[in-house]
Structure formats: structure tokens, C-alpha cells
Amino acid sequence: MVYSYTEKKRIRKDFGKRPQVLDVPYLLSIQLDSFQKFIEQDPEGQYGLEAAFRSVFPIQSYSGNSELQYVSYRLGEPVFDVQECQIRGVTYSAPLRVKLRLVIYEREAPEGTVKDIKEQEVYMGEIPLMTDNGTFVINGTERVIVSQLHRSPGVFFDSDKGKTHSSGKVLYNARIIPYRGSWLDFEFDPKDNLFVRIDRRRKLPATIILRALNYTTEQILDLFFEKVIFEIRDNKLQMELVPERLRGETASFDIEANGKVYVEKGRRITARHIRQLEKDDVKLIEVPVEYIAGKVVAKDYIDESTGELICAANMELSLDLLAKLSQSGHKRIETLFTNDLDHGPYISETLRVDPTNDRLSALVEIYRMMRPGEPPTREAAESLFENLFFSEDRYDLSAVGRMKFNRSLLREEIEGSGILSKDDIIDVMKKLIDIRNGKGEVDDIDHLGNRRIRSVGEMAENQFRVGLVRVERAVKERLSLGDLDTLMPQDMINAKPISAAVKEFFGSSQLSQFMDQNNPLSEITHKRRISALGPGGLTRERAGFEVRDVHPTHYGRVCPIETPEGPNIGLINSLSVYAQTNEYGFLETPYRKVTDGVVTDEIHYLSAIEEGNYVIAQANSNLDEEGHFVEDLVTCRSKGESSLFSRDQVDYMDVSTQQVVSVGASLIPFLEHDDANRALMGANMQRQAVPTLRADKPLVGTGMERAVAVDSGVTAVAKRGGVVQYVDASRIVIKVNEDEMYPGEAGIDIYNLTKYTRSNQNTCINQMPCVSLGEPVERGDVLADGPSTDLGELALGQNMRVAFMPWNGYNFEDSILVSERVVQEDRFTTIHIQELACVSRDTKLGPEEITADIPNVGEAALSKLDESGIVYIGAEVTGGDILVGKVTPKGETQLTPEEKLLRAIFGEKASDVKDSSLRVPNGVSGTVIDVQVFTRDGVEKDKRALEIEEMQLKQAKKDLSEELQILEAGLFSRIRAVLVAGGVEAEKLDKLPRDRWLELGLTDEEKQNQLEQLAEQYDELKHEFEKKLEAKRRKITQGDDLAPGVLKIVKGYLAVKRRIQPGDKMAGRHGNKGVISKINPIEDMPYDENGTPVDIVLNPLGVPSRMNIGQILETHLGMAAKGIGDKINAMLKQQQEVAKLREFIQRAYDLGADVRQKVDLSTFSDEEVMRLAENLRKGMPIATPVFDGAKEAEIKELLKLGDLPTSGQIRLYDGRTGEQFERPVTVGYMYMLKLNHLVDDKMHARSTGSYSLVTQQPLGGKAQFGGQRFGEMEVWALEAYGAAYTLQEMLTVKSDDVNGRTKMYKNIVDGNHQMEPGMPESFNVLLKEIRSLGINIELEDE
């Protein structure tokens, strides 16, 4: 493998055996591609804004004299960039401008004569834009739109599995689900009649729909039944015979023809009888007259002579009717063929319960069901039915729906109209009846072929269409009002409804979520999340077990492991690593094609529906050099079942062993050795890890760390290759390689880094360069590490030396004993940044004022404020300190005589304002790292605001001029090259000032042209610089657009350093979580023979019952990795020659049976080997991919190479006594995470505080400054102890005895510790409730 200069700094040893056929795809593509589809111009008009416009426009006036046509649209440039939007608290969006054409037709002239055309560009609101990382900035906060897994449009056949009716009879139903429009359900009832429901309303007999479609009874029977024809000849009744229909029947008379008896009366008819009848070509048999009684007539029979109806279609025949028919000359009678086995009489029975008999009555019936209480008219009934399923505006199956619909009904074509046709409805009914008759199967709703993904773009498009439809109504009204000659398109379009619909979706939809920004992994997982909840989806309460379960079709599409615990389990899932959506929105996963028994590298993406037709081998099947399967029988999946197949039956093979799991689960090493429940917790807890002060790459990883870190967008990645020309903490400058430059550009890339910014979860986002001056970089190399990344690899926690042993009960019940060294080295110290805002409003009594002149506040409290009343940057503040001084005017109060006297003596005290300053919340302390002041336009800026403004201007100017210098230097070096090549001497040039270079003339025509081009570029550069500076200056100095009534906002940012302490929650990656019980002095920790103490002691009893053995293997492998690092460290300390180092490191990389990774250190220069060794000192990082990881033998070999015992256990000594523990202990390195459940955020104590309004009991929870609940179980405990007085105190004065508690407070203040319990308020509430039932209870005093 070829490594770039940056990648050679640290190479992770990979234990994977299976070749990597397909690289991990870009992990955010599901979000970015979907939104791109929404925004980009689509000439076909299939997707996005274009599709929405085309579906609503052209809008015609009611009279048809004018119409508004859509021409095209364009998105403008956003006003602020992403960072500015976050600081200012506005939405990152672009204005949408639409070109519309108003066409007015002549009234009197023939159809289509145009009188006037006006075209105009109209503003239609703002469209929020997606950032490069797949998020949206809405009102200054980053949000993610989660994709939704919903039921695909189409037709579904299902059954109630016998649960509806008490008899346990299975009732079948069919449901046509459109993309938008009314649902149409067909269902059987226990009596086998077929009913229809529209939009889940009252059910009607299904034949009503057919009658409404203008079918007569005769035509309906014709559609659904085969005929049995009887003929009357010579007073004998004969029946046309179709032998196949007799199968399984019992003959009720002798079946004979041509004098030969084929079946005797009472015998069952078998296949042999049928063969004989067919062989002899028997067409007619004689039947007894009684046989026809009870048969159902298939059409109307009319007496020709009188014109009266003898019997109507769907009537049962009797012998009387037969005689009448015979008399009136009907010798050929058609009846319906039904039997109990596979031709039920369902439609015929349904027609009997159908109250309607023609189209109009059917339409009226449907109208009454949809609009109860309204008087039906013919027009209303017709238009209602027409609009339900047959109007393009109200009903749309969508391309997906039509495809699924036609596939389900086994039709050839998969495209078609978006509305229903007569045939569609009849075919659905036919298939439902077939299923009831035992032919065909019902669908599986949880199959991923029946559920599809709706992503951002699609949902935004739907919302946008909703807004457009609202506008459409207004435009129609406007077009009908006349005065069209003066009307322009922009007078008709009101952008409010459109932007309101879009804003509502991005701001408050259930699927628009506040981004989880704990660490890069939680960001990436949030964007790849798939929810079954949300509008048009399921609800938590209604979802049963089946929907939440892992389905065979999830394989490679949805992760079976990563889902939340709790009420949402199984409803919120995560996309698998390689999964993507196809054009219809179904999830598909890649497979390698197998051709003639050879596994090729050709990749096919298969959806769940297609996958069912193939036999697919597992990724870990063994192959030989040519790509044949080694074993004769291969474990494969087919139709959702796993079993053995012979190797020539295999069609496809999995791409990778990690294709089953999601990104989160693919980061757990030795996942294959963990129980699934614990793996779920492990995957979920990695997302809660807080970024530590110094990121530390995991010694034992899975090889996915780099992909996650780079794709999450928290690192700075080189867009083009080049050389590092300048680097400091806040910017990196790359001089681009010649071959990657665009013609006519300076060839300089500048990367500005993010410094100490607050994330959504109050963690700290900070980027640090990881390249040095003069280093070569290639495209895609990581230039700067972000939070939780280390040299471009995800690093969520720290590698800790752990021992599995009990230690004095301090690791009882998953507690964790931690060494003080961990605190000293700041291993788990994290920085949290809090934003505190102070808003100055305009009140009725006058404006609030931000000032340092606050009434009744001592000097000490103001010591940290400047003269504007705003805290200094760098000030250390604690709970209760003032950050921003603010006073609010208050109304005049009545003064007491004493106050009046004091006023008169001491002059006017500022009595008309009250202190409403912003103070630091209790329990928070930290350093002020930034202050921002936003002032409304037209309000005078205070001194501090002007200072901040000046500083920002200075910084912007400095940044831009530095940028200009860098670009100029690049340009002049090229000018110099041209001049020297054109014959100007280098010494002469260096004496001239640079500006004069461009005035020199060259004899060579071509070189002179180049020089002129460069001179143009130089002018353009300077012009561009001026323009940028002016734009920046305008943005900084202009007033801010604040909410109505707000004059000023001051935001202060506090950085809080949190060290690890008892009560903090920690976890490994295998679901092994615990709480720190004690921080132990280093000298008391167990130590080994070299005197190295362990950092963390874990309870060995936490492993066996939880079955997450992965943590033990990780510990052993971590030990081996560290051992090799220690050996390299020793060699570096002894300053051994490079050859020895190279040889040892090469041995480590080559270790392991047939691993895929080949590292050839002979291609590395000595300097590169030394730098690699330097980076391996702390341990050699190892990758053990999921389901393809290191084997036990390989771990032992690695331990041996590091001169460590192969058992993985060593002798430990007690730090307090120095005695050896009685048996060897498992010691190694485990990657531990500090989770965002910090004791500082949870600790809370109440003395007195707020009470609930009705019950008068203290509130609960830290946010309300609430008390601790003393629940019924606690009451039982005190009762059991007989602690009556304690219990009385708990239930009265400490809770809701209002008078008692105020007296108690007074008593304690007076130093008298007696209580007088009274009546708890809850008892009064109970009395009131009983009285509300009409029972009067009164309390009597004794």
C-alpha cells in the first residue's frame, strides 16, 4: 500500500484478513445527496423545487382568461456565512427568486389568442441551506433532519392473523396507500362479505365502489366469476362440463355420458376420473333437475313477450323459476361457478348486502359516508368521488407507488399514471379474493422492500409544495378580480405562506432535531439515523413488537445493534456502513458478483426485493487465489434464511465483514465476542463520550477511526496537495502543487481553524494543526485535528492501564477505582463552554439599561465589570457573580414616611430602577473567554461594543492583509520566474521594488503576454481585497437584526474545566459502564514487578454474567501494543541505529497469519522511520476489524514480541502493604471513555424553594430547584421502623403543611428546634376531590 507523507507518521497495524474490495463510502452522503437533489435544477422536473413548481403551476383563473406560468428559479447568495449565522443567531439560508410569466388571453377571440404576456422575477422567501457537514443552521443552532422510514406507497395485502373475531377466523384485507391522497381499504368480515373503507371511515359493501365506477350487477359478476352453463333439452337438464372444476368434490349423482358411468353417486372425484373425462372429451352431462336449485343466475332474464323480469342477476334459482324460464323460451341458463374450496361466492354475497342498485345511489352512499349530515346533490356526489382517486391534484401514487402497485399485481410495466384506474381497483379486489381463496400470500409489512426512506430533500420538497398550494388559492382569487392590465406577477405572490411552511418544517418538525454534538461520532450517527416516528410514521404507543424487531432484510441496510434502549427501541435505527438509498428510496447494500463460481470484484447494489431472488455468501467465506470458494458447502443467505449451499449455486458474496453494522458498532473491537445487548450499550455510549483535553488514539481500534474522523467534518482536510507554507494555531497555508492548480490563480489554499467554540452540548470545539512547516501534503490528508481526533483518527477516550481485581469493595456493583495519577495527568479533564445571554428590552416604563451603576450592590460585586457594565474577558467568575449589569425601570411605589424622611435628608436615591443583572448560575464557575454585544440599528453603541467592533475590524483587516501578502508572494514568485526566463537578470530584479517588476518590458512576445496576464491578476487581487474588506467592515459595523422590543443582547462565554471526580460516569466500548467510587493515591494502587501502578481497577465479576468478553481481549491486545511501544521506546532511548529499529518495527507489522495489510518499511527514508518510531513510543496502534479481528494465537504472538507473558496476567503487589496478591491478575490497556453524565451537572441540594401550586408540595428536579421525593416505599420503610415522628415530619412540615413549614422556618431561625405539624395541603385537595363527586365531608374538631 502507498502511504502519503502524513499517513506515514503513524500506521495502524491491521489484523484484517479479508481483502478490502470496496472502500467505506462517504458517510454523510445520505444527507448531502438528498438535499442536493432538492436544490439543483432538474431539467426532467422529477425532483426537488423544480418538481414542486411544475406540479402547482401553471395556475389558471376560474374563468380561464388568464394564467400564471412558471419559467425557472434561482437561489441567491446567503447574506452571512455559517459561522456568522451561528454567532448572530440567524438562519443560514438563501433567497429564492422565481421567474413567472403572466399570460392574458383575449376574451372574445377564439381559444388561445394571447392578449398580453408579462414576465417578472418574484421573491419567494428564504430556503435554509445545508452546510458542508449535512446540518442546517436554524436561528443560530445546528440542527439535523433525520431520515424517516415510512410505509412505501403501493398496495398491501395483509391479514389480521385471526385476532379480530372471537372465532379465530383469519380476515384478509388490502390497502392502497398513495403518496398523497385518500387511503382505500378492502376487507372481509367474518361472514365473508367484502367491504371497502375510504380513509379508515365507516365501511361500505365493496361493490358500491364498482357501482360508482358505472358497473352493473351483471358486469360485476362477469368480472369476478366463471360461469356454469345449463341447457334444457328434451325436458332434461344438461350441464356443460369443465372436468377440472370437479376436483375434490363428492358426486351427488352418477356422472355419466354416452352411456358410460364415470363416477358413481357418493364417490369422491379424483384426478383419475378427471383424466378419463378429459380423454373421452366429455362436454355435456345430464344432471338431475334439483341440482340447479340454489345456483345463482349470472345475468338478467326477461320474458321477451311481456318484457317483465323473470329473474335478475345474482338471484338464486328455484325449480319454479326454472319452469318459468323454460316456458318463456330461455333454454340456456348461465349460473355462477362457486365452491367452498377455492371459488368462494364473496362478491355475490356482498351484492346482496349492497343497498344501492345504480351509479347515482352508490355515489350518494359514498358522499354520505365521507360528509355525514350534508345534503347530497348529484354534482357534489360526482365531484367528490372523482376527486378522491381520479384527480391529479388530490391523489398521487408517485413513481414508487406505481412501481410497487404494478409489481404487486404482477404486471409487466412498472411505470404508469399517478392516479387509480378502474382496472387498478378491480385487480386489487381480484387479488384479495384470490388470497382469500387460498392462492397467493399476504405481504410482510416489516420487509424493507415495503418500507422506504424519506430524506431531507424529499420532506423539504413536500413542505414547500404545501406552501405553494396555499399560495395557489390566493393567486386564483387574484386572477379573477379583474384589472389584469395593471397586474404584475409579484402583486399576486405572497411569500409569507411559503416561507412559513418551510420555516415550520426546519424549526419545529419532529424530525428536525437539535444536533447531538458531544463528539464527532455522535454527529455522524445523528445524521445517519433513521426514524420510524414522525409525521406520517408510527407512534411509540401504537408500534408493536414486529415493527421494532430485527428483520432478515435489515442485513447490510440497517444496523441490528445500534438502537436506543427504552420506549424507542427498534423504532430509531442507524444506517449500516455501506448502505445507500436507490432512486425509489429503498435501502440497498453492495455485493460482489459471483460468475461461474469465481468471486469477482464487480459490485452490484441490491435492494431488499431483489436480494430475495439470490443466494448470497458471507464475507468470511474462504477463497483461493483465483477467487473460487475453498469449501464445497458455503454458508449463504437466501430468502431471509441462512443455510449451506453448494459453491456453484452462489450468486453473490458480501463485500465486507462490517457491512452488517452501523458506524457506531463498527468502532467496537472484538464486537464478535460481545453479547448483543452489551454491544448495543457500547455503541450508544460511545456517542456520549466527552472530548478530553488531549485526545489519545485508541491502541486497539477497528480501522474505521480515520473514516469517521475525516467524514464527520471536524478535522481540516487538504482540498489539494502541496507544501505547508505557513502554520499557526489559527490558520494553515498550503502552497498548491503546480499540477493541481487552475490556470491563472495564485495557487494558495488557506485553512482557517475553529478555536474554542461552544458545541450544542456545551462541549468545546477546537482545532489544532497536526502538520509542520515545509511538510508535503496530499489531497485528503488531515491538516488539523478537531475535538476527539488524534492525527486524523477518532479518539473518544484514553488508553488506561486497567487491572481486573476486587479492591476493598470500592468496585462493588460496577464501581470504578481510579488512581490519582489520572487526575494529575489531566487524562479525563474536559472543557465545557457555557453561553449566558443578557437581553435588554424596551419596557412600558422605559428601556432597560446595561450599566455598571446598579442600585444596592457593593463595590466587590462590580470589580469584574468594566465601565459599560460588562465583565472583562479572562475574569474568573463563580456562582452569583454579576456578568452583565442591567437595571429595569419600575413603577412608582408608595413610600413610607420614614423613607420619605431619609429621601429628603440624603437626596434622591435611584429608586425608580431595580437590579435585573445577569448573574452566573449557582454551582457554575469558570473563566470568561469571550463577550459579544449585539445592538439594534439606531440604538447608540456603548463603549464596550465599539471596542469589540474595533477589535473585530482589526482582526479582519489583519487576516485579509496576511492573506493578501501570502497570495502576493505566490504571484510575485511566478512573475519573477517569467521575467528571469524572459532574460532579465536576477540580481537586477532583486534591487528593484516588487511593484516596478510589472513595468519591465520583455522582447519575447509570449513571455510579455504572460507578464501582462499576471499584472491583470495582481490588479484583480488588490481589487478583490478592497471589496472583501469593505464587505467585512459593513457586516461588522451595521446594526443587528434583533427580535422586536429587544435593544441589546450581551452574550458571555464561560469556559469550565472539569476534572474527573467520584460520581462521574465512565465506560469502555463494550457496554461496561460504571461510576467512579474513589480516587485513590498513586502509592496505594496495585503495582507490578517493575513498580508501575495501574490506573484503574475494575471488578472482574462484571464480565461473566454480562458476556462482553471483548473487553478482556481488548485488554490483552492493548497490553501487547503497549509492550511493543515500550520496546521501541527503549531502543530510541539507547539511540540504537535506524536499521535495528526498522527491522523490529517491520517484524511487528508482518506479524499475523495472512493479514491483508502490507507495510514495507524499506521504502521509507531513515527520517520517516524515526518519526514513525517516535509516534509508536506510547504503543503501536492496532486495528482489529469487526468479525475479522485478531485471533487468540495472534494476540499471544504479539505479547511474545513485546516480551510479555502470553497469559496476559501478571503478579501484582498491594500498594498499601507491599504484599503480593495471591494470584496473577489480568492487567492491560483498555480504552476508557468519560461520558457526558457528570456529577457536577447532577448534584443538587435544596433548603427551601418553590412549591407546586395545587398540592403545595416541593417541586422535583434540579432545574426547578426541587426536593427529593419521599415516595410510598420510603414511607413503608419508616413505618416498618416505627419512626412515627420522623414520618410525621416528612409528611407535614418538610412537605405540604403550609402553616407548619413557615412556623418551622421561623423557629429554626430563632434557634428553637420544635415543630407544630398541621394539616397537609394534599389532604385538603383530597377532600375537594371527594366533594366534586357530590359527597360532602366535613372535618369536626373534637
Swiss-Prot record:
Residue numbers of N6-acetyllysine PTMs: 1022, 1200
Keyword terms of this UniProt record: Acetylation, DNA-directed RNA polymerase, Nucleotidyltransferase, Transcription, Transferase
GO biological process: DNA-templated transcription
Molecular function (Gene Ontology), one example: DNA-directed RNA polymerase activity
Catalytic activity: RNA(n) + a ribonucleoside 5'-triphosphate = RNA(n+1) + diphosphate
Entry annotated with the keyword Signal: no
EC number: 2.7.7.6
Enzyme class label: transferase
Family: Belongs to the RNA polymerase beta chain family.
PANTHER family associated with the record: DNA-DIRECTED RNA POLYMERASE I SUBUNIT 2
Function recorded in the entry: DNA-dependent RNA polymerase catalyzes the transcription of DNA into RNA using the four ribonucleoside triphosphates as substrates.
Protein name: DNA-directed RNA polymerase subunit beta
Organism encoding this protein: Shigella flexneri serotype 5b (strain 8401)
